[in-house]
Amino acid sequence: MPEIYVAGTPVAGSPVAGTPVGAQTIAAQPGSNLLDVLLEHGHKVPWSCRSGQCQSCLVQARPDEVPSAAQAQLNAEQQSKGWLLACQCQLQQDMHISLHNPATDDLPARISDMRYLADDILLLRVTPERPLRFRAGQHMVLWLDATLARPYSIASLPGEGDLEFHLRLHPHGAFSNAIRERKTGDTLYMGAAAGHFHYDPGWQETPLLLLGSGTGLAPLQAIARDALQAGHEAPIVLWHWSRSQAQCYLADALSELADQHSQLSLHLRTHAELASDLTQLRLASRKTLALLCGQPAFVEQLRKPLFMAGLPGRQILDEAFISRP
């Protein structure tokens, strides 16, 4: 039976480095999932997608103890340091685990702007302590303290200075309530940018079909702007569904962008119109690439209509996260 030696859990509510408390030895069943084991034993490891895409559940182990599958989606530097994704780790041997501590493992950033884009959507801009590399549409984990973190898509482009995020706020959410109490000048911590969901310069002559709901618009509009800035030549069609016509929180900015770029066309719709809209999807070309962003149920709802419209699975990229408040 594998044993997990957990070095300790950072103190909840503390944003600064210190000696972790609660060192623990856990006996686990062979083949059990490391994330599940840690959560069951009271360790507050952030998680979202459980597929390895969001990279929220990073923990560290001795490099020779890490199953290769638990590192497959990480970069070479992370792998060499023993970082792994707990959700992708099936336990087969003893492991020595250190939990992620944002104050020592991540990049500090100062909040430069906070304002509402809609009743429940907060624009958050932050200034990183130093420049960092990312692609428009990728995501990163934002930490408010040593145990409270969520992944968010980057809504800004490289070169725009501050990083921008669009946060859906939940009435009784732990992260939502905590971020409401923050103010400009406060510090949070940012993980590394991650994810395959971004514009590729090799797509210049490929028609793009961007489909999103809610704050899934954040990475999609960034990808559209990045493509246009890169001189994208083929059509870009952006569909967005919100709870009401007034809920497309970027309607004015997107309309202005479409006025400036003839290859960009917009369809800003409501959730009530989604089923009907999907029956009318048309592809500009068999070479079209579709990018989908939203809740898992929304992403799955789009797959069959896209297939029926003639789009093979290899031409569909998606970013689907389980929304955790």
Predicted regions and their residues:
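Short, charged beta-turn/beta-strand-edge "cap" motif at the junction between a beta-strand
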Residues: L91, N101-A103, A146-L148, A192-F197
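FNR/FR-type flavoprotein reductase catalytic core
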Residues: G161, H166-P325
